[in-house]
From Swiss-Prot:
Chain intervals for the UniProt region annotation (Disordered): 760-804, 924-945, 1214-1247, 1306-1330, 1580-1621
UniProt entry keywords in alphabetical sequence: Cytoplasm, Phosphoprotein, Repeat, TPR repeat
A Pfam family of this chain: Ran_BP1
List of residues that carry Phosphothreonine: T19
Source organism per UniProt: Homo sapiens
InterPro entries tied to this protein: GCC2_Rab_bind, GRIP_dom, PH-like_dom_sf, Ran_bind_dom, RanBP1-like, TPR-like_helical_dom_sf, TPR_rpt
Protein name, UniProt field: RANBP2-like and GRIP domain-containing protein 5/6
Length: 1765
């Protein structure tokens, strides 16, 4: 709220009264000045701001505010001075620099300061239009001297912004001022192709003036005629554009003047017309535009005039529109516009569209209006009246174009709606999708009986936009579709129409059109609607400015909710009803299944939104929102009396959607519940369609009765419609088709019923119908119940009967081939025997051929149909599921009429031709694949002409096969004699004298007999009684063309079984153009190799059979739905369809969503088959020893790595290790160590066999091989399933790729992996484990030593962090990288530096020395970020950088600061820094890490007993070793799933990373760096167990632990351990162990080394650690496989846990899980290390012992928490 001057003065006085200090009063002057500025008291504002500047002279905001006040007073000099001072105080004010430059150029361009500030602003705003204008002003003041510079400036600006109107006009003006008119005309001609310029009034005015000046100049007179014609062409086009823009934006007087100027240009061009050139075509088109604009101007004059005679104006306007509409379209192309569209063609479409619609609008409701206009005004009098109404000048009419044009030849031609719809599409392209134009067109169609083609309009504008979305519930801009935009346009047109009707008052003349012509009508849509439409167009065409993209998306997203009636949409119910009715009507009129489904589906969506509102309307009215997208109109509010009718319409739409989806029964039930003519009509369509579908086949009596019932129901419903229409005429309006169409359909149904009553569909008047007159077809449609009520039933030219198309194609094919057959048939007639009875055909005698596959039709004779091609196998009408008319269009070259003698003629129809064939038809010369395993005879190798190609792939059924003798039907069987002599093709008998049995039946059989055999075989068995003749007839057939020898067809699918086959359309993604391209149409098969079990996917194109997909199916493949379709799946695979392996992204599109879902299920089932793992539930849990062995191997690896660390740190430790090895007590235990528990143990055990891994294997992305695990043999030493780094001949598993890139799937018939069990391999007692060999797919290159430059430096600090660099140009911190930041110290010169590399890429992002003058400072607002300045060399060159590093934790940040300060001190003292590594490892350095170890340990379960005799199990050790006694007992334990032979693999299982070592730590005596060296020794005849943990940090139970007080390393290595760190009693042992807390702190271990020795040891230790890290990196691939197998083990654990038979061990397993979870989630360190012996011991104890262990662990944890606290 703006304050007045009095309000501000009172407020200022009150504030000053409370402020005693003068300085404080002055400090408030800025605020007071702003208040006075708001009150527009600029003098008082200057007064207070000046008092503020006196005390705060360096405030840039105050100087800027003062400059603004001076600028308002137009005191430019003082304003510039204030702005300049503000910029000096704050140079970041870029906009103020531009402001100073603009003020100086505005004040005095010649001022030298202006040039300086313009150049300064140009550096800050490169490419800014404001800068260009300032530079242009500076160059203009230089006159002719600056023209060259100005020309260069304009050219450079045009290159950046070619659509800028001002720059183009400026260039043309520069050409004109320099007398370079030809260049100006050339630029105008070139720029006319730019749509942005064509829509500018200023640009078109400039072009018209330039072209007129050029035509009048001397240059034009000297030029040739073609140049003059081209210039005239451009001038006429410019006049047309200018006239259109002027009508929209200027007043009537300017429109008149411009139209008169346009008239003069047409008159001058008229005199020089000749021939069919560009100027003539343009002149004719511009004539039409001239009259169209004249008619629009007349109506505009009526809109703005007073006391207007609308009748006179409308009649003259109708005359103009008639002339414009009857101007023919141009026949030549003028030039190409945007997107290659012809410019004249688009202008002609726009003219015809506007003129046609205005003619219909003016003549609406007036009979013979156009005829009267032509009779009255199509003469000289009317022409004179038109001239007087348009032009006000007194020039003679004869010299003008309008006065001299001949208008007496026009006809009364009313536009056709079909033509208008076609013209509208071109007009939309001309207007580039303007919402105003689309709304105007919609309003014109709103008054016409036909529906507007909005769908076609939008498809012209948005080619690639999907028609419908499956995500109606979302409002994401990416989900927008054509239907959303169509609904939006419907809403805009609907509300605009209602608004126009409200404006038409009672004085509205009948001659005044409801909607004015497009150029003169006001804006028809709201600003909100226009902004949303523009935002959608910008996003779809990807023309958004980067900074404006988010705003556009938000705008589109907000209105999508309204369009889809989501949430609080605020739509008027009447509008929702309008949308639903329009969509239902449009969808019903479509022939496309998907069109119907999408339109009717969206209609149902809106009806569901309307129905709840209708219930509310019964009680209350719907509230109107404040600012809706579509305005509410109370004139169309739904009344309570209309609610029932709308609810009925909604339920009819629901039923129609059911019918479209194929739910016919539901649709029939719904329609029958609604008593209305619309439901009766739909029911009639449904039942008639059912009858048609049955009629297509040869009908049985039951089918005839069913068809008759359907036709009867159809007749009854049609009669109901006619009766209701006769009784109530208002009912007819609801009917979706004319009543005449209903009567026509009824007559057709009655005729069909009469046919049934006369003998069925195959009989008429007691005789057989002609085959060629009764062939019926069914045009395939995605839905067989296409409800099209908007069209007449059968006689509409747009939708002919479904069978006519196929019948016409069949008849055309017959006509083409009759001539080819006639010659041969004449020869056959001449050679035929007169004694033989002829086969009587309906017209002529043709040789018998076969029919194309899939052809169906009514046939005169069973087995002898009228046919077209000879390659199809079927003789019955058996339509294929994927019916394709291409089967009927085989090339004529396939037709080979067989020349035969008179002996080959068939019997007459009286005797019949009754071959007992199956519905699958005949097959010539080849059997079905299903019969290949049967014994077959070799086809006869003679000159027979009956061997055809293999077309078995087209039909699944089996049929009669000619050319085989074993179990097939042959012509030899047909004419078999009584003596039993057979018949062979091509065999000549010299004694043959003709048929002796002429006149008898050749073929007689019984269909029932063959029907019984059809279930087991597709071939006919021989029947001697059925095919015997009286004499032995040796029939000889002479082939017309000698057939080549039969070649066995090899497809590569011989040894494979078809698991799945379905017709699909395949697509391939082209990465170059980023589009899906169709690859072929055919059957997609999934084949299984019967030998090796491999599965592959194969697809061949139809007819040509070219392979378009051929690849293996692996478990790593993943089906993903294709966006925008629920019938398509896409996947990636190495495809071999082109011969070589190529990674392709493929997509298969199915006919229905059900088929797509079936394919997905089959695909996943095949992936599960690849796993080949049987699902078995163990009935008894038996411990086979695998879990125990797995834990043993893991612990061996850990202890080996720890001992290796200890070995690296101390020479004394090395001595101890050597002694241990010498006495056979190696702590790192070799990998041969096994656990040998008591053989007599009968406790409960676990079984780890019979894995069911199918569920998890599908998620496995590593291996596609199948794994089969089976129970192991009960041998003491078992063979392991997996083994690294060794090869064994008995290997059953290999990580070799299942797909070799050098061979295609069709060539690889051998399995790449073999699956077996442990029992399949014979092992001996000496073979401890099977060595599994893993052959790499791609060999690795030789290992190259990587030199990082950090070799001679120790890592003092290392932790993951994020580093930033300060960018001075933008004044912001910018992220430089994320990685490990290290502080390194050189061993030689003690220099310290900071090094940081980015993750993965390892690029340096920090590299500089730490100098004494450097200091770390906290960044404001956070304590975890340190900031410093250094000379950094990260980019190779020295550069001063402001750096900042951010850590995740506060203690890490503090540690970094501490080490940083120590580094500065250490450099001064020339000493080494004590290393501190703040974390153990990074993900990159530790591929496996502790999580993998924890998961591995979590997945293990075992139970063993304590070793007997003197061997005591050391519960605290990390490595278990067995007794070496000669007595060997069988261990019922499970071998581990993984056994690693390589030492480097073992080392990954260490629980800690190798750390830099600190001498003089506080570990207990006998420990070094946290590791115990008090290795307990056994007796002389037993081995020792090394203790890998002791000291203060390794106590299991402080209260019960007893340690040696004064022991050292030498004593511990020679003495026998008496007190163990942790031990538990067993059932067989009564030994009690006590645990006591040490009485005093153990003494520190001191090592007296020299400085050089310490440095040398640290170097060697660091190098060893680096070498260890290298080994860890080498086995990264192995770890990945390990982790995947661990996942499989986890899934098995979960399965076993769900087993009800594990009740006894469930509690123990639950506790073990809890301990393991504690181990996983504890931080690395002593707390985690202390759990290891607990876990190991627990896994070996009985349930009772584990319960005791639980109490021990609980006490330990409580003590640990108290000590840490």
């Amino acid at each position: 709220m703006r304050r007045s001057k009095a309000d501000v003065e009172r407020y200022v006085a009150s504030v000053l009264g409370l402020t005693p200090s003068p300085r404080q009063k002055s400090m408030k002057g800025f605020y007071f000045a702003k208040l006075y500025y708001e009150a527009k008291e600029y003098d008082l504002a200057k007064k207070y701001i000046c008092t503020y500047i006196n005390v705060q002279e360096r405030d840039p905001k105050a100087h800027r505010f003062l400059g603004l006040l001076y600028e308002l007073e137009e005191n430019t000099e003082k304003a510039v001075e204030c702005y300049r001072r503000s910029v000096e105080l704050n140079p970041t004010q870029k906009d103020l620099v531009l402001k100073i430059a603009e003020l100086l150029c505005k004040n005095d361009v010649t001022d030298g300061r202006a040039k300086y500030w313009v150049e300064r602003a140009a550096k800050l705003f490169p490419g800014s239009p404001a800068i260009y204008k300032l530079k242009e002003q500076l160059l203009d003041c230089e006159g002719e001297d600056g023209w060259n510079k100005l020309f260069d400036l304009i050219q450079s600006e045009l290159y950046v912004r070619p659509d800028d109107v001002h720059v183009n006009i400026r260039l043309v003006e520069l050409y004109r001022s320099t007398k370079r008119l030809k260049d100006a005309v050339a630029h105008c001609h070139e720029a006319e192709r730019n749509i942005a310029l064509r829509s500018s009034l200023e640009w078109n005015s400039c072009v018209v003036q330039t072209l007129k000046e050029y035509l009048e100049s001397l240059q034009c007179l000297e030029s040739d005629k073609s140049d003059w014609q081209a210039t005239n062409t451009d001038l006429l086009l410019a006049y047309a554009n200018l006239m259109l823009l002027t009508l929209s934006t200027r007043d009537v007087q300017e429109n008149r003047e411009l139209l008169e100027s346009f008239d003069s240009a047409l008159q001058s061009a008229k005199s020089s017309l000749g021939g069919n050139d560009e100027l003539s075509a343009t002149f004719l088109e511009m004539k039409g535009h001239f009259y169209m604009y004249a008619g629009s101007l007349l109506l505009k004059m009526g809109q703005h005039g007073n006391n207007v005679q609308w009748r006179a104006l409308s009649e003259l306007a109708a005359l103009c529109y008639l002339i414009a509409f009857q101007v023919p379209r141009p026949k030549i192309k003028l030039r190409e516009g945007k997107a290659g569209q012809n410019l004249l063609e688009m202008m002609a479409c726009d003219r015809l569209s506007q003129s046609g619609h205005m003619l219909l609008s003016l003549s609406r409701g007036k009979q013979d209006f156009l005829k009267e206009v032509v009779e009255t005004f199509a003469n000289k009098i009317g022409q004179s009246a038109l001239y007087d109404a348009l032009f006000s000048s007194q020039s003679p009419k004869d010299t003008s174009f309008l006065g001299s044009d001949d208008i007496g030849k026009i006809d009364v031609q009313e536009p056709e709606l079909e033509d208008l719809a076609r013209y509208d599409v071109g007009a939309i392209r001309a207007h580039n999708g303007s919402l105003q134009h689309l709304t105007w067109l919609g309003l014109q169609w709103n008054s016409l009986p036909a529906l507007p083609g909005i769908r076609k309009w939008l498809k012209q504008l948005f080619h690639r936009l999907p028609h419908e979305t499956s995500r109606l519930e979302t409002n994401a801009p990416e989900s927008i579709c054509i239907l959303d935009l169509e609904v939006f346009l419907l809403g805009v047109v609907y509300t605009s129409h209602l608004q126009l009707k409200e404006k038409c008052n009672s004085h509205h003349s009948s001659y005044q059109p409801l909607c004015l012509p497009f150029p003169v009508c006001k804006q028809l849509c709201t600003e909100r609607q226009k902004s949303w439409w523009d935002a959608v167009c910008t996003l779809i065409h990807r023309k958004a400015v980067p900074g404006n993209l988010a705003k556009l998306r938000l705008l589109v997203q907000h209105e999508i909710n309204t369009l889809r009636a989501q949430e609080k949409h605020g739509l008027q119910p009447a509008l929702l009803v309008h949308w639903a009715k329009y969509l239902q009507k449009t969808g019903s009129g479509l022939n496309s299944f998907y069109g119907q489904l999408e339109y009717i589906g969206r209609s149902v969506h809106y009806w569901k939104k309307v129905l709840p509102l209708l219930k509310i309307i019964k009680k209350n009215s719907i509230p109107e929102p404040i600012d809706p997208l579509f305005k509410h109109f109370h004139s169309v509010d739904i009344q309570a009396s209309e609610i029932v009718e709308y609810e009925e319409d909604a339920h009819i739409t629901f039923a129609m959607l059911d019918a479209v989806n194929g739910n016919i029964e539901d649709a029939v039930t719904a329609f029958e519940s609604i008593k209305s003519v619309v439901s009766y009509w739909n029911l009639a369509l449904i039942f008639h369609r059912k009858a048609e579908d049955i009629e297509n086949d040869a009908l049985s009596p039951e089918e005839q009765e069913e068809c008759r019932n359907y036709l009867t129901k159809t007749r009854d419903y049609l009669i109901k419609i006619i009766d209701d229409g006769d009784s109530n005429l208002s009912v007819v309006k609801k009917l979706p088709v004319p009543l005449e169409s209903v009567k026509q359909m009824l007559n057709s149904v009655m005729q069909e019923l009469e046919d049934y009553s006369e003998g069925g569909p195959l009989y008429k008047n007691g005789s057989l119908r002609n085959a060629d007159s009764e062939i019926k077809h069914s045009t395939p449609s995605p839905t067989k119940y296409s409800l099209s009520p908007s069209k007449s039933y059968k006689y509409s030219p747009e939708t002919p009967p479904r069978w006519t198309e196929d019948r016409n194609s069949l008849l055309n094919m017959i006509c083409q081939q009759v001539e080819a057959i006639k010659k041969e048939m004449q020869e056959l007639k001449l050679n035929s025997s007169k004694s033989a009875s002829r086969h009587r055909w309906p017209t002529e005698n043709y040789g018998p051929d076969s029919v194309p596959d899939g052809y169906q039709g009514s046939q005169t004779f069973h087995g002898a149909p009228l046919t077209v091609a000879t390659t199809g196998p079927s003789v019955y009408y058996s339509q294929s599921p994927a019916y394709n008319s291409q089967y009927l269009l085989r090339p004529a070259a396939n037709v080979t009429p067989t020349k035969g003698s008179s002996n080959t003629e068939f019997k007459s129809t009286k005797e019949g031709f009754s071959i007992p064939v199956s519905a699958d038809g005949f097959k010539f010369g080849i059997s079905e694949p299903g019969n290949q395993e049967k014994k077959r005879e070799k086809p006869l190798e003679n000159d027979t002409g009956f061997q055809a190609q293999d077309i078995s792939g087209r039909k699944k059924g089996r049929g009669v096969i000619f050319g085989q003798t074993s179990s097939t039907f042959t012509f030899a069987d047909v004419a078999k004699s009584t003596s039993g002599e057979g018949f062979q093709f091509g065999k000549k008998d010299l004694n043959f004298k003709g048929f002796s049995g002429a006149g008898e039946k050749l073929f007689s059989s019984r269909y029932g007999k063959m029907a019984n055999k059809a279930n087991t075989s597709g071939d006919f068995e021989k029947d001697d009684d059925a095919y015997k003749t009286e004499d032995s007839d040796d029939i000889h057939f002479e082939p017309v063309v000698q057939m080549p020898e039969k070649v066995e067809l090899v497809t590569g699918e011989e040894g494979e079984k078809v698991l799945y086959s379905q017709g699909v359309k395949l697509f391939r993604f082209d990465a170059e153009v980023r589009q899906w391209k169709e690859r072929g149409l055919g059957n997609l098969k999934i084949l299984k190799n019967e030998v090796n079990g491999k599965l592959r996917m194969l697809m061949r194109r139809e007819q040509v059979l070219k392979v378009c997909a051929n690849h293996w199916i692996t478990t790593t493949m993943n089906l993903k739905p294709l966006s925008g379709s629920d019938r398509a799946w896409m996947w990636s695979a190495s495809d071999f369809s082109d011969g070589d392996a190529k990674l392709e992204r493929l997509a298969a599109k199915f006919k229905t969503p059900e088929l797509a879902e079936e394919f997905k299920q089959k695909f996943e089932e095949c992936q599960r088959l690849l796993l080949d793992i049987p699902l078995q539930t163990p009935h008894k849990l038996v411990d086979t020893g695998r879990a125990a062995k797995l834990i043993q191997r893991a612990e061996e690896m850990k202890s080996g790595l720890k001992d290796f660390k200890t070995f690296l740190t101390n020479d004394q430790t090395k001595v101890t290790e050597e002694e241990n090895k010498g006495s056979g007590t190696g702590a790192a235990g070799a990998s041969d160590t096994t656990i040998k528990p008591n053989a007599e143990n009968t406790g409960p055990t676990l079984e780890w066999d019979n894995y069911d891994l199918r569920e998890d294997a599908l998620d496995d992305s590593v291996s596609s091989s199948s794994v089969h695990a089976s129970p192991l043999a009960s041998s003491p030493v078992r063979k392991n399933l997996f083994r690294f780094d060794e090869s064994t001949t008995g290997s059953n598993f290999s990580f070799k790729s299942a797909l070799s890139l050098s061979k295609s799937p069709a060539k690889l018939n051998q399995s790449g992996t073999s699956v077996g069990t442990d029992e399949e391999s014979v092992v001996t007692q000496e073979e401890e484990r099977d060595g599994q060999y893993f052959e790499p797919v791609v060999p690795l290159p030789d290992l190259v030593e990587v030199s990082s430059g950090e070799e001679n430096e120790q890592v003092v600090f290392s932790h993951r962090a994020e580093i930033y660099r300060y960018d001075k140009d933008v004044g912001q911190w910018k992220e430089r990288g994320i990685g490990d930041i290290k502080i390194l110290q050189n061993y030689d010169n003690k220099q310290v530096r900071i090094v940081m590399r980015r993750d993965q890429v390892l690029k340096l992002c920090a590299n500089h020395r730490i100098t004494p003058d450097m200091s770390l400072q906290n960044m404001k607002g956070t304590e975890r970020v340190w900031v410093w300045t250094a000379c950094d060399f990260a980019d190779g060159e020295r550069k001063v950088e402001h750096l900042a590093v951010r850590f995740k934790l506060q203690d890490v940040a503090d540690s970094f600061k501490k080490i940083f300060d120590e580094a500065k001190t250490a450099q001064e003292k020339d000493s080494l820094i004590t290393p501190h590594v703040s974390r153990s490892s990074t993900p990159r350095e530790s591929p496996c890490g502790k999580i993998a170890v924890a998961i591995l340990e979590e997945t293990t379960r075992e139970r063993t007993d304590v070793i007997q005799g003197d061997d005591v199990a050391d519960a605290a050790s990390e490595v278990e070793v067995s007794s070496t006694s000669e007595t060997t007992t069988k261990a019922v334990v499970s071998p581990p799933k993984f056994v690693f032979v390589s030492e480097s693999v073992k080392r990954i299982f260490s629980s800690e990373k190798s750390k830099p070592f600190v001498f003089g730590n506080s570990s207990a005596t006998g420990s070094l760096f946290g590791f115990s060296f008090n290795a307990p020794l056994k007796s002389n005849n037993s081995e020792t167990s090394s203790v890998a943990q002791s000291g203060s940090e390794s106590k299991v139970e402080p209260k019960k632990c007893e340690l040696s007080k004064n022991s050292d390393i030498e004593q511990s290595s020679d003495s026998k351990v008496k007190n163990l760190s942790a031990s538990f009693p067993t059932e067989e042992s009564s030994i009690n162990y006590t645990f006591k807390t040490p009485e005093k702190e153990p003494p520190l271990w001191h090592a007296e080394f020299t400085k050089e020795e310490l440095v040398q040891k640290l170097r060697s230790t660091t190098k060893s650690a680096d070498h260890l890290n290298g080994l860890l990196r080498e086995i990264e691939a192995t770890n990945a496989v390990l982790m995947e197998q661990i996942k499989l083990l986890k899934s098995e654990i979960r399965r076993l846990e769900r087993n009800q038979e594990r009740e006894k061990s469930a509690a123990n397993l639950e506790y073990l899980k809890n301990v393991l979870l504690q181990f996983i989630f504890l931080k690395p360190g002593s707390e985690r290390e202390r759990l290891l012996p607990v876990i190991n011991t627990m896994l070996q104890l009985s349930p009772e012992e584990k319960g005791k262990l639980a109490a021990v662990a609980q006490d330990e944890e409580e003590n640990a928490s108290r000590s840490s606290g």
